[in-house]
A protein has these predicted regions:
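Membrane-proximal, lumen/periplasm-facing interface regions of secretory-pathway glyco-
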Residues: 346-350, 372-435, 441-458, 463-466, ...
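Hydrophobic/aromatic-rich transmembrane helices and adjacent perimembrane loops
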Residues: 86-87, 324, 328, 342-379
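Transmembrane-lumen/periplasm boundary regions of multi-pass, lipid-linked membrane glycan transferases
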Residues: 201, 213-322, 333, 338
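Transmembrane-helix signature of polytopic, membrane-embedded enzymes
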Residues: 39, 130-152, 170-171
Length: 533
């Protein structure tokens, strides 16, 4: 039976696959009694089920590992819970959505450790979005390969345990690209509206979504098929949906004097010499090659040398459009970030590459696939399993080796709970009221805010200008705990003494780190600033 047809610009596209993978059981059964054959057959017949199995394993592994090895929350997770409860429309360095989500998870579960679910869940949602986009372009089996190829990029496994803005943006990038493609192909108003909403939510997650929006805009302008949509209402519906959803945060950004943009400017290293206009971009590009090289190798050994039939086949108009779209989504944001860095003389931070590669395997399969013969499927399966197991092995190996060789303290060994209990108890004994406000160096203050039973509000960096939720008059009436790790450059005790009215010399608290290895204790200096009449 011929599949239903739908509009594709001014051409016609099939409802279903841009191309079929031509897979048949016989192609893998030729592998004889190879134990991989049943797995490959199942994956090709039921790609959605296989994806669900893989994603469940991903969730279990990358939630359990940090829970079992971390005595204290990671830096980002502590910040999530410390600041998310303030429910601001924006914060001094990032948009608020990840912190809101973390606070909701904590409120629902009542467990601090529940936030370790969020990073893997964000990656899973991203994978689903990429898979659905792949299903718009090709068969389920090929779309599955386009998703599972991401296994070799540490952003989506090893680093996913640190849920914050980098992880939160992933699903919205994927779904924005999905609905934008559907809108271009089908022309339905709902797809245009959803594309705009998803793009806005990507901005609510991290302002790096600017490069995704710019990529989409350039594709709409310069692709000959996509450009035809400009004569219809769709792109303007997308823009309207985007503006409506982003409006509250955009208003906050303007009212704050563009504080987050200042933070980004401070984070990116500025070229000081002429040679650095070459070396800094080279470092950035090299970092992305390093982070993606396992996936590049996996795709290389799977897709090359190309099948003669695939290399010689002339793509249909539908397939050509899908290839262009996937290639632009896979490489466009990276090219724009690199170009902006070169023009401005600033080098992007390596971790800014987080969302840039989610479409790379999908594009590779579209351009150089399909992967249909038994040998290539077996090679991909073996490579995938190896890389899937390699991530946890490196995580566990690093955890064990750090016990013997690491000199620098780890955030997950910070005794946040012990510090919070001690200082909260001392506050109650000396002041007799709940601890409402805490200020000081970032990690120490955030840890007290998370682990103290009083859940105090944080004055970020001890600076009220970064903390608009703080009423300084109320702070003076209730008092504040000011603390910092001794020896940190970020500590500003003289400034904090003036800001909070602290008196006398700060007290000293030594707390052993939450580890059995021999290491120096955490030295906390602090003031208990009592309520003022």
């Amino acid at each position: 039976m011929r599949p239903a047809r739908r509009r594709f610009g001014s051409v016609r596209a099939r409802q279903g696959f841009v191309y079929d993978d031509g897979f048949m059981d016989a192609r893998t059964s030729s592998a004889g009694e190879d134990f991989l054959a049943p797995v490959v057959n199942f994956a090709m017949r039921h790609p959605g089920r296989m994806l669900a199995i893989v994603l469940f394993a991903h969730l279990v592994v990358w939630t359990a590992l940090p829970l079992l090895t971390s005595a204290n929350l990671e830096l980002d997770l502590a910040e999530d819970l410390a600041l998310g409860k303030e429910w601001q429309l924006g914060y001094w360095k990032h948009p608020p959505l990840p912190w809101w989500i973390a606070d909701l998870f904590y409120r629902v579960s009542g467990q601090i450790g529940s936030v370790y679910l969020l990073g893997p869940l964000a990656v899973i949602a991203c994978y689903v979005g990429v898979y659905l986009l792949g299903r718009e372009m090709m068969s389920g089996g090929q779309a599955l390969i386009g998703v599972l190829g991401l296994v070799g990029i540490h952003y989506y496994n090893y680093s996913a345990v640190k849920f914050a803005h980098d992880q939160m943006q992933l699903p919205f990038w994927a779904f924005a690209a999905l609905f934008f493609y559907r809108a271009l192909v089908r022309g339905k108003a709902l797809d245009w509206l959803l594309a705009g909403a998803m793009l806005a939510l990507a901005f609510w997650s991290k302002y790096a979504a600017f490069v995704l929006a710019l990529t989409m805009g350039l594709f709409l302008l310069f692709d000959p098929v996509a450009r035809r949509s400009l004569g219809r209402a769709g792109p303007y519906l997308m823009a309207l949906a985007f503006c409506v959803v982003i409006a509250p945060n955009a208003w906050w950004v303007v009212e704050s004097g563009f504080l987050p943009m200042q933070y980004v400017g401070h984070r990116a290293k500025v070229a000081q010499r002429a040679i650095e206009f070459v070396t800094l971009p080279t470092v950035w590009i090299s970092s992305q090659i390093f982070f993606t090289h396992p996936t590049l190798i996996l795709l290389g050994v799977t897709l090359f040398p190309r099948r003669q039939a695939s290399a010689a086949a002339r793509p249909s108009p539908e397939q050509a459009f899908a290839r262009r779209y996937a290639a632009v989504m896979a490489l466009g944001p990276f090219a724009l970030v690199t170009a902006i860095g070169i023009v401005t003389g600033r080098t992007p931070v390596a971790m800014w590459g987080y969302p840039l590669w989610i479409f790379m395997p999908l594009a590779a399969v579209l351009w150089f696939g399909p992967v249909v013969d038994a040998l290539r499927l077996r090679v991909f399966t073996i490579g995938y399993v190896f890389l899937f197991l390699l991530g946890p092995a490196i995580f566990i190996g690093t955890f064990i080796s750090d016990h013997y060789s690491r000199a620098r303290p780890k955030a997950t060994e910070f005794p946040g709970a012990a510090i919070a209990r001690h200082l909260t108890r001392e506050w109650h004994e000396k002041v007799g009221t709940p601890l409402t406000y805490v200020a000081g160096t970032e990690f120490a203050a955030n840890s007290v805010a998370v682990y103290s039973p009083d859940r105090p509000h944080v004055v970020v960096h001890g600076r009220p200008q970064f903390s608009p939720w703080i009423d300084m008059a109320d702070l003076r009436r209730r008092g504040a705990l000011v603390l910092w790790e001794e020896g940190l450059v970020a500590a500003r005790p003289d400034e904090w003494r003036a800001t909070f009215g602290a008196q006398g010399e700060p007290a000293l608290l030594d707390v052993p780190r939450a580890t059995s290895r021999r290491t120096a204790p955490v030295r906390i200096r602090y003031w208990i600033v009592p309520p003022q009449p």
